[in-house]
């Protein structure tokens, strides 16, 4: 869970704030699913470089007086374009072997929001989510309807295989094999044996990423406005149009200038059931809790 960038400035002296309005940006590339022992120095360099580039893109906009929303979109767009992350290019695959992408954004000043779910052909879902917020009367558009809206605005369409990578195909194959192993065990009537027993540690480390690979950003601009954004490919081997918390305002994303901005990453079903992002803001607003306490309690 990533908390508000406003927290970074909660202790700043008033005099300093008047001379130089605070601003900041925080990003995440997933909830820490990569096993350090499995990561090569080259891979770590690649991940750190990609995260730094996204951070720099958003931070530079803020430094020049850009809005929090601009910064969030700029940072997330770079993560969507990088195949290392489970968002945009490099997203995980559904059971059918395609990418279905979700994204959302929220402006904390007026609590406006936009989201898309299940899109397959829009290159940068975070930009489409912002368009839903800025250029439609709606909050969420889904599937082909969202794609038609993108077409009406001239968004770039790409074939679905643009998003797909060999690494994600391998993860999908592992997930399918685990499903088949579980089915075999059920037929044998041996629930005591874990399906994981049929796979090596490295197989499981590879498969672990399928649960937590969401990317996101929160920002505070010089005008004191907060924004939050989240983008994801969801879970490997997901079925039946499954949608997690990332595009759901109040669950995986929330921003309110009066409290905080939140971009969540983790098991989406739990974030939805607990309405986590909004709960954090509500505990700050109504219980007077600081952001860290609110996050632990939500």
Task: List each model region and its residues.
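Alpha/propeptide regions of enzymes that mature by internal proteolysis
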Residues: 17-298
């Amino acid at each position: 869970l990533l908390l508000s960038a406003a927290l970074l400035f909660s202790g700043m002296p008033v005099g300093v704030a008047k001379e130089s309005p605070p601003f900041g940006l925080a990003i995440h590339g997933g909830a820490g699913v990569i096993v350090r022992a499995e990561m090569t120095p080259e891979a770590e360099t690649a991940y750190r470089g990609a995260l730094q580039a996204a951070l720099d893109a958003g931070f530079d906009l803020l430094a020049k007086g850009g809005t929090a929303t601009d910064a969030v979109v700029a940072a997330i767009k770079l993560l969507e374009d990088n195949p290392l992350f489970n968002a945009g290019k490099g997203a995980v695959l559904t059971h059918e072997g395609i990418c279905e992408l979700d994204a959302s954004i929220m402006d904390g000043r007026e609590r406006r929001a936009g989201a898309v779910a299940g899109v397959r052909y829009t290159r940068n879902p975070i930009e489409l989510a912002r368009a839903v917020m800025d250029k439609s009367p709606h909050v969420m558009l889904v599937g082909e309807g969202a794609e038609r809206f993108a077409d009406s605005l001239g968004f770039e369409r790409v074939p679905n295989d643009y998003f797909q990578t060999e690494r994600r195909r391998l993860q999908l194959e592992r997930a399918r094999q685990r499903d088949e192993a579980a089915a075999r065990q059920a037929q044998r009537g041996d629930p005591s044996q874990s399906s994981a027993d049929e796979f090596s540690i490295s197989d499981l480390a590879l498969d672990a990423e399928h649960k937590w690979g969401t990317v996101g950003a929160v920002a505070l601009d010089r005008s004191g406005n907060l924004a939050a954004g989240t983008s994801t490919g969801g879970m490997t081997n997901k079925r039946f149009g499954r949608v997690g918390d990332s595009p759901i305002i109040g669950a995986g994303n929330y921003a309110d200038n009066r409290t905080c901005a939140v971009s969540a990453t983790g098991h989406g079903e739990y974030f939805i059931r607990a309405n986590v992002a909004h709960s954090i803001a509500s505990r700050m607003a109504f219980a007077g809790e600081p952001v860290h306490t609110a996050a632990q309690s939500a």
